[in-house]
Amino acid sequence: LASDALLGRNTPSPGLDTAAAYIARQFQQAGLQPVRGAWTQEVRMQTIALGDSNALTLTVNGKDTAFAIKDDFVPFDMTADRLVQGDLVFAGYGITAPDLTYDDYDGVDVRGKIVVIFRHEPRENDTTSRFNSRKNADRWGMAAKVKRAREHGAVGMLVMNEPLSHMSLTPRGYPWPSLSRIIPKDALPMTLMADDTEKIPVVHVGERV
């Protein structure tokens, strides 16, 4: 699987197909049973690229301030491709955990608004914390936070690094090739194909925002 002949097994690529065929043969030789008569399953995915018209503007006391992509904000790969506007509402870490009697959305109305949250979880550097991310990575991950925001009716999400736990407040979002000098231009992110109406704009913002 690490052979140079597979050329890194990029997704998709002939090298990845060769690796899949090899793994299927190993499964067969090991006596495993195929699922539904096949050693592989189809997963529909798509590559996405950052568009040319991304913009973020905040209006405070009637004054508009436009921010620069990369320096001030970077969209996540899970973002929706649409224009939204609305009031900003802060919702902590955007976590709802009934078993921990913790809910950042308790008493917070984000319906029709853009929710602002911190990345990660409370006390993220404390391994003894009940929010320990190693045990709850799926629950506190971005996908879970976006899903929770949508369930509460938010139309968009701005994400920040929590300043007490992060020395850098530089926006990261997703390492888009078009914003990087070191990432190959064809190294576009891949996501499962989904209806864009099920998404909301999700943007990582920096200190100036």
What is the predicted function of each stretch?
Residues 1-2, 42, 88-91, 114-118, ...:
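Structural recognition of the beta-strand scaffold that forms the well-ordered cores
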Residues 1-9, 194-196:
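Acidic/histidine-rich, surface-exposed loop or edge segments in extracytoplasmic proteins
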Residues 7-128, 170:
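Noncatalytic luminal/extracellular "stalk/propeptide" segments of secretory-pathway proteins
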Residues 9, 13, 135, 199-203:
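Hydrophobic alpha-helical scaffolding
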Residues 14-26, 38, 141-148, 153, ...:
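Extracytoplasmic/secreted proteins, especially bacterial periplasmic and envelope-associated proteins
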Residues 70, 151-164, 168, 176-209:
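Long, well-ordered, tryptophan-enriched scaffold segments
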Residues 125-136, 142:
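Proteins synthesized as precursors that undergo proteolytic processing into mature forms
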Residues 131-133, 172-177:
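Short secondary-structure boundary/capping segments
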